Amino acid sequence: MEYIVEKIGMSRTITNPSIAVTLLRVVNAKVCEVEGGKALVAYPKGKASNKCVAGQQKKYNLSAEYNRFATLEVANTEAGDLDETPLNEAKILKVSFNTKGRGYSGVMKRHNFAGGPASHGSRFHRRHGSIGNREWPGRVQPGMKMAGHYGNTKVTIKNEVVSYDAENKILVVKGAVPGYNGAMGKIRIAK
């Protein structure tokens, strides 16, 4: 089963020893249509709307707040509210979020290159150095580590479930989760 969640932030338990935990809020979602265990799900995110979204809202009889759509594996067999009962027995989750974007970064930050000497007349400090051979192959090989956009990539990690508050829809998982506070992600029940 899969669910859309919002990252609230990190905290720790008051046990001894304390455990670093991440708080996730399960987003209210409506199942629009189900086919073979997969479902089209609508959920609220911001106030963005256009005629395409308005048409889908009218088709599935949704209120204006449900303005985003996703395909998830669900426990539901028919349209309606998303069934969240499997979260009560969940032990391990696969949590998928986009990492924090760090913009255009050099090779030392992006790929942990050592760089060159700092002093003694060196004019090679934070650059990447040679990127190819000679006449053969006469080109840069695919996959060469270079400067470029760093972060904002999908990362999936496994986390243990510490607790789940079904009334407030707050999920507490052990350890850290990628992304910024307020980021939207996806969880899948692994066990």
UniProtKB/Swiss-Prot annotation:
InterPro entries membership: Ribosomal_uL3, Ribosomal_uL3_bac/org-type, Transl_B-barrel_sf
What UniProt keywords are attached to this protein's entry?
A: Ribonucleoprotein, Ribosomal protein, RNA-binding, rRNA-binding
**Subunit composition and interactions:** Part of the 50S ribosomal subunit. Forms a cluster with proteins L14 and L19.
* Recorded family membership: Belongs to the universal ribosomal protein uL3 family.
Please report the organism this UniProt entry assigns to the protein: Campylobacter jejuni subsp. jejuni serotype O:2 (strain ATCC 700819 / NCTC 11168)
Outline what the protein does.
One of the primary rRNA binding proteins, it binds directly near the 3'-end of the 23S rRNA, where it nucleates assembly of the 50S subunit.
Identification of the protein by name:
Large ribosomal subunit protein uL3
Q: Which Pfam families match?
A: Ribosomal_L3 (PF00297)
Q: Which GO terms describe its cellular component?
A: cytosolic large ribosomal subunit
According to the record, the residues making up region (Disordered) are 115-137
SUPFAM superfamilies linked to this entry: Translation proteins
